[in-house]
Amino acid sequence: MEDLDALLSDLETTTSHMPRSGALKERPPEPLTSPLTQMGPGESSGASGDKDHLYSTVCKPRSPKPAAPATPPFSSSCGVLGTGLCELDRLLQELNATQFNITDEIMSQFPSSKETAGEQKEDQSEDKKRPSPPPSPSPVLPKPSATSATLELDRLMASLSDFRVQNHLPASGPTPPPVPSSMSEDTPSPPGPTSKGSLDTMLGLLQSDLSRRGVPTQAKGLCGSCNKPIAGQVVTALGRAWHPEHFVCGGCSTALGGSSFFEKDGAPFCPECYFERFSPRCGLCNQPIRHKMVTALGTHWHPEHFCCVSCGEPFGDEGFHEREGRPYCRRDFLQLFAPRCQGCQGPILDNYISALSALWHPDCFVCRECFAPFSGGSFFEHEGRPLCENHFHARRGSLCATCGLPVTGRCVSALGRRFHPDHFTCTFCLRPLTKGSFQERAGKPYCQPCFLKLFG
């Protein structure tokens, strides 16, 4: 396009120098008429000065007049003009070869209505400020006929003008007639598209533009919730596709697009709803278990809640003991529920002795008077207490009053005590008192002779 503008500028300069020849002064022909000079003030399309010059140079005049005989200086100018027109036709043929690419580029880069209106106002203000050059009396020469590329360019510019005018008007107003072009007599302008056609065209252009940019426009499947096609953002989960606003928690309807979720029976749930509805409950606090879990005694527990119900300490390597469905540590279980020793009343943990209808620690089953262990495994019982032989007879009064040993055979009962037969003697002469006669003084037995001698 820059080459075309430069060539048109050269042609304008060449045309401006033509009136200087003497032949033109004798018979000034009519000035060259362009389609833009015949249009009224209300029919101006708002195009720039370069575009006006392009139309006035390319378009075929309506009624060309025969030119006067050319003088030698004028024939040289005509040769220069013919060469320029040939160059213009060559450039237009190249433009015709790339018309489809130009059309796509123009349609994809439509300016907004505000920008177009601003450009038209600026162009009109510049045209008013710019002084109009005096018409140069140059002869009208026969020009080559417009080529097919020229016709195609006129049709494209007319369509573009129609589309811009339609965008400027409100949707409810009537559709204005298309702006006339320079080739309106040869090629009629296409009718303005309807609103539905314009919408379909714009949607098609948008879809093609997105496709060229690598953005997919086809449906990405049916939503797993509303069963409608998905276009745009999509969430893929549970083997299906979802609209982002439809992939929500099955309990509280919270959006789950960018957060973690749990699945139950094919439905997504947020962590709060999933744990509240489907997680096992702790046997102590009755709250849902979210992470680690201990299974014992037919129920589930938080690890920090599975502890001794008596002391509250967690169970170590020694494990736990159960009583009526409740866990206890070993120490508290034995302290609360283990059998008690009859001697020390402490819990029996290991070995024990069963005697006198009770359980005893081996170290606690001794004589309850002297705490001496029983030799030979035999013991004597008195009032439910185990005693050795001596303390048993002492409790029952069956010890010899002289030697202090138990009396197991024959005995002599005197003075409220028991004696071995050989140990019941006179306190002074130590003779046995076998005859059964004796005297007593201060709780001691005496024979008759010694009593008379001592106390006579």
Curated annotation (Swiss-Prot):
Annotated segments matching region Transcription activation: 1-195
Record-level GO cellular component terms: cytoskeleton; cytosol; focal adhesion; nuclear matrix
PROSITE patterns: LIM_DOMAIN_1, LIM_DOMAIN_2
Basic and acidic residues bias spans: 116-130
Annotated positions of the Phosphoserine modification: S63, S132, S136, S138, S159, S181, S189, S398
Domains as described in the record: The LIM zinc-binding domains mediate glucocorticoid receptor coactivation and interaction with AR, CRIP2, ILK, LIMS1, NR3C1, PPARG, TCF3, TCF7L2, SLC6A3 and SMAD3. The LIM zinc-binding 2 and LIM zinc-binding 3 domains mediate targeting to focal adhesions and actin stress fibers. The LIM zinc-binding 3 and LIM zinc-binding 4 domains mediate interaction with TRAF4 and MAPK15. The LIM zinc-binding 4 domain mediates interaction with HSPB1, homooligomerization and targeting to the nuclear matrix. The LIM zinc-binding 3 domain mediates interaction with PTPN12.
Entry protein name: Transforming growth factor beta-1-induced transcript 1 protein
Organism, scientific name: Bos taurus
Taxonomic path: Eukaryota, Metazoa, Chordata, Craniata, Vertebrata
